[in-house]
Amino acid sequence: MILQRLFRFSSVIRSAVSVHLRRNIGVTAVAFNKELDPIQKLFVDKIREYKSKRQTSGGPVDASSEYQQELERELFKLKQMFGNADMNTFPTFKFEDPKFEVIEKPQA
């Protein structure tokens, strides 16, 4: 009888504690999201700016025409070297078993 009451009481406490912890975790997430340092804020702003530039350009950010031409040349070389294969997949290899010649040993 006492054990049953104890188990009921412990389950009530456990549920109350879990609700309390969930609320505290939500509050601490907001507190940790705050940018305290001005240098950190500048750094995060630059990263966001770079990300938006990269998404709009669809490639490298602030790349000169020489860089783009060099990139195209290197990709062309790779496509020629690997037979116009898809560069994003791992190549498949086909190995054949070597064929050995059977040599008869002379009987001594």
Swiss-Prot record:
Mitochondrion as a keyword?
yes
Organelle targeting peptide span: 1-32
Task: Name the Pfam families for this protein.
Answer: ATP-synt_F6 (PF05511)
Question: Record's InterPro entries?
Answer: ATP_synth_f6_mt (IPR008387), ATP_synth_f6_sf_mt (IPR036204)
Q: By its UniProt entry, which Gene3D superfamilies does this protein fall under? A: Mitochondrial ATP synthase-coupling factor 6
Q: Which domain of life is it from?
A: Eukaryota
Single annotated GO MF = proton transmembrane transporter activity
Q: Which residues carry this modification: Phosphoserine?
A: S65
Cellular component (GO) terms are: mitochondrial inner membrane; mitochondrion; proton-transporting ATP synthase complex
- Which residue positions does N6-succinyllysine occur at? K94, K99
N6-acetyllysine (modified residue): where?
K41, K46, K79, K94, K99, K105
Q: Where in the cell is it found?
A: Mitochondrion; Mitochondrion inner membrane
Q: Which family does it belong to?
A: Belongs to the eukaryotic ATPase subunit F6 family.
Query: Subunit details for this protein?
Result: Component of the ATP synthase complex composed at least of ATP5F1A/subunit alpha, ATP5F1B/subunit beta, ATP5MC1/subunit c (homooctomer), MT-ATP6/subunit a, MT-ATP8/subunit 8, ATP5ME/subunit e, ATP5MF/subunit f, ATP5MG/subunit g, ATP5MK/subunit k, ATP5MJ/subunit j, ATP5F1C/subunit gamma, ATP5F1D/subunit delta, ATP5F1E/subunit epsilon, ATP5PF/subunit F6, ATP5PB/subunit b, ATP5PD/subunit d, ATP5PO/subunit OSCP.
What is this protein's function?
Subunit F6, of the mitochondrial membrane ATP synthase complex (F(1)F(0) ATP synthase or Complex V) that produces ATP from ADP in the presence of a proton gradient across the membrane which is generated by electron transport complexes of the respiratory chain. ATP synthase complex consist of a soluble F(1) head domain - the catalytic core - and a membrane F(1) domain - the membrane proton channel. These two domains are linked by a central stalk rotating inside the F(1) region and a stationary peripheral stalk.
Could you tell me what this protein is called? ATP synthase peripheral stalk subunit F6, mitochondrial
Per the UniProt record, the source organism is: Homo sapiens (Human)
